[in-house]
Amino acid sequence: MSLAKKIDDDEKQLVKPVNKEQTYKKPIPLEEDDYIEGLSYIIQQQYFPDLPKLKAEVVLESEEVGSFDAQNESRDEKLKYLIAKNSEDPLRKRLPSLAIHEITKAQLDGENKPISVASYQNKFTSEDNASFGELMEDESRLRAEQHKRRFGVHSQQPSNSIQTIGYSNSDAIKSIAWKEKDKSIKTWNYQPKNALMYTPETNHSSSLSQIKKQSTEIQADATGLSQSFLEAANQPSTDPIVPPSVNETDASVNGYPLVDVNFGQAVGSSSKSYFNIPERPRRERLHAMRVRDIRSHSTNTTITSVDSASTALNSYSTPNSVSRKLTNLTPAARRLVARSYLRSPLHGSSPSASRHTALRTSIPKFSWTPTPRVKSTAPTPKRV
């Protein structure tokens, strides 16, 4: 786009020159077979000019060899490629009838210049390409509307445009005005459509993120009973209390009361508590007392038996007195004395032998070192 300067008497203006030749025209849609046939003909004439001659030579060689199959297959091709140049080509005659543009007709007739592939595609197109182009235009239009709706950009009133001075025509201002770049920091404003994708932490949280945040927060009011419920539960009951009756009993099955009986169904209200721990039977209480007595007595007798055993070992008593003392001990003390004293290999079978052994073992053994012998020195001479 070029801008031309137009000088007037009063003011100077920048006017965009109007070029009428640069008008865009949509290509003419053709049927798919016709479009492909014309395109193949142009490619063959431009890039493979000797291809018809080569095919004709192959057909002639097949006739000389006698390959009738190749003759039957190339029968239609011989009619195309063995025709003289000045004769009418059926393909060249068919293409101009499909075209509408006058310049394209003249180029296809071959009077001035051969038509190129680019010019052919600019003038003509297939029906499939045309329908696809319409779909792309609709998509771009929807994207532009979405862009305007999302970012607040309106083509009629551009907010970020340079204020020019000296322009009288508003159309000229719109044609050369451009949008200023945003000076703020670029942030990621993309919002995913799929809830499983990562949700960006932008300045403005989406409704989905707010709902998730509310569901994960723990509120103190929701963790217990409300105050109104507690007050209602603590209020005294206004229901009439049925007076207890001595002759009436609560409903029970095999001695077990029906706990789930509603108020009013039972014949009376009992003051008994069905959730107490029952008292231990007398048999179990006597057994526990007996066990405690035996444990305390066994502890005392063990201490006394150990003392008596030690005195018996250290005393000068006869075997009969020792046996009498052993009979007064408990079985555990007797086993201890028998294991440590009577059946020990270090002691004899009689108390006298044990006494001598005890005396022997009680005497401490002292280790001594012999003093080395010192040679006698000469006597000190007497002083006169």
UniProtKB/Swiss-Prot annotation:
Has a role in maintaining cell viability during stationary phase induced by stress response. May be involved in pre-mRNA splicing. Heterodimer with ish1. Pfam families: Es2. One of its GO terms (cellular component) is catalytic step 2 spliceosome. Residues 1-22, 344-384 are annotated as: Disordered. PANTHER family: ES-2 PROTEIN - RELATED (PTHR12940), SPLICING FACTOR ESS-2 HOMOLOG (PTHR12940:SF0). Belongs to the ESS2 family. GO terms for biological process: mRNA cis splicing, via spliceosome. This is Stress response protein bis1. The gene is bis1. InterPro entries: Nuclear_protein_DGCR14_ESS-2. It is found in: Nucleus; Cytoplasm, Cytoskeleton, Spindle. Keywords: Cytoplasm, Cytoskeleton, Microtubule, Nucleus.
